[in-house]
Amino acid sequence: MLQRSLGVNGRKLAMSARSAKRERKNASTAASKCYVVPPSARGWVHAYSVTATSMLNRRKAILDYLQGAVWVLPTFGVAIGLGSGAVLSMIPVKSGTLIDKLMFQGTPGDARGVLIVVSATMITTIGIVFSLTVLSLQIASSQFSVRLLRTFLRDVPNQVVLAIFACTFAYSTGGLHTVGEHRDGGAFIPKVAVTGSLALAFVSIAALIYFLHHLMHSIQIDTIMDKVRLRTLGLVDQLYPESDTADRQVETPPSPPADAVPLLAPHSGYLQTVDVDDIAEFAAASRYTALLVTFVGDYVTAGGLLGWCWRRGTAPGAPGSDFPQRCLRHVHIGFERTLQQDIRFGLRQMVDIALRALSPALNDPYTAIQVVHHLSAVESVLASRALPDDVRRDRAGELLFWLPYPSFATYLHVGCAQIRRYGSREPLVLTALLQLLSAVAQNCVDPSRRVAVQTQIALVVRAAQREFADESDRAMVLGAAARATEVVERPGTLAPPPSTFGQVAAAQAAASTIRSADRDG
């Protein structure tokens, strides 16, 4: 697309852009992405690339909003129902044919009655569906986590069912004005339209049955956790590709020069997304550098520091007056956290389910253990991937843009810390955490990550020693900690099977403690 856009501006310009593209591809390294813009093509390349990328980012943002908007598909359903009803009402059916025998056979009064009954039934059904949907949202927020409401709102099957009901209602209601008499006094019955209304009524019955089936399964805790896990793993693959498994050389963000201009948050909210490509392209064409110091997912207040920007070159200086504003246009702040670029939010959703399960109101430690199992899948993948900041440079190595990402220790802390604190009185929850840490340690290559795992193991041991008065409970946790520590200290060691951390290990620890007490007695 880049060559096609530049081709209209001259063959020389297109060749220059293709050459720049080849040089950029050869000069890219594992540590950063490079943007090379020839001086002759800088204006056109910048205008095209920023516009195209901005449109793509806007489409992603709009799509993310529409996926969570319940009104979109029902609105399309109403439009389709009205349009198809108007078209089918104009289709004549020749009397006496096979098609005529399959169509609605009745008087204009019968046709009007059918359409009224279908319309009234759909209104009642839509009310029932809305009530059940609100009930499921209430269950999700009270039993699991209020941060899961967005997941339920994005549920496409619910939106499709509502769209079918809305389409049937609009189709039948719109068909009422077509039933009547011709100008010559003859009766007019839109047989095709009335038959279509009856067909849509049966489709709506099938949709209602499917909706009830889907709703009963969607509020199950296993289904909810699996959805959150899969979405989080999908984001991990997007931000940290699987092919990029080797740990990169750690880069330290540069210190902003004295005349750097701060990037201040225009309003309060959560940092949801950053259009990295837009800012990097603009910085490459304008010889500026931008550095963010705030993580995606953090809450910022109006006027709070997001980062810095300054002019690149032999004599750095303050950027032009429009550069900070252009950067801020591509830094999106909203009232809620999203999973577009925030892995920690996916971990937070799962942790919230565990904390709600461990609360005195529910007291369901097994659900918390299930959450830890799903967390281990995400944390193990993070342990096996390189987790660099998103750094963009030009071919000369000049920094264009720097977006920081949380470290592995931060991800591990988010997944373990609060569950350890709230589950410190249940030994099986702590052993599940140690099973998680053992699986994570098996995938760690970087020694610093093993240190982070060892720190979490030590914190679990301290919690067990502080909370458990029963020797068997304490022995079970300490034994699991010893097995996890062995995996940490011996790279290449496989994590023990889950049975060594669960109920079997608990029974063995209890029996061993009783035997020891009997011998001592």
Curated annotation (Swiss-Prot):
The keyword Glycoprotein does not apply. It comes from Mycobacterium tuberculosis (strain CDC 1551 / Oshkosh). GO terms for cellular component: plasma membrane. It comes from the Bacteria. The chain crosses the membrane at residues 68-88, 114-134, 160-180, 192-212, 290-310, 399-419. Pfam families: DUF2254. The lineage of its organism: Bacteria, Bacillati, Actinomycetota, Actinomycetes, Mycobacteriales. It is a multi-pass membrane protein. Keywords: Cell membrane, Membrane, Transmembrane, Transmembrane helix. This is Uncharacterized protein MT1328. It is found in: Cell membrane. Residues 1-25 are annotated as: Disordered.
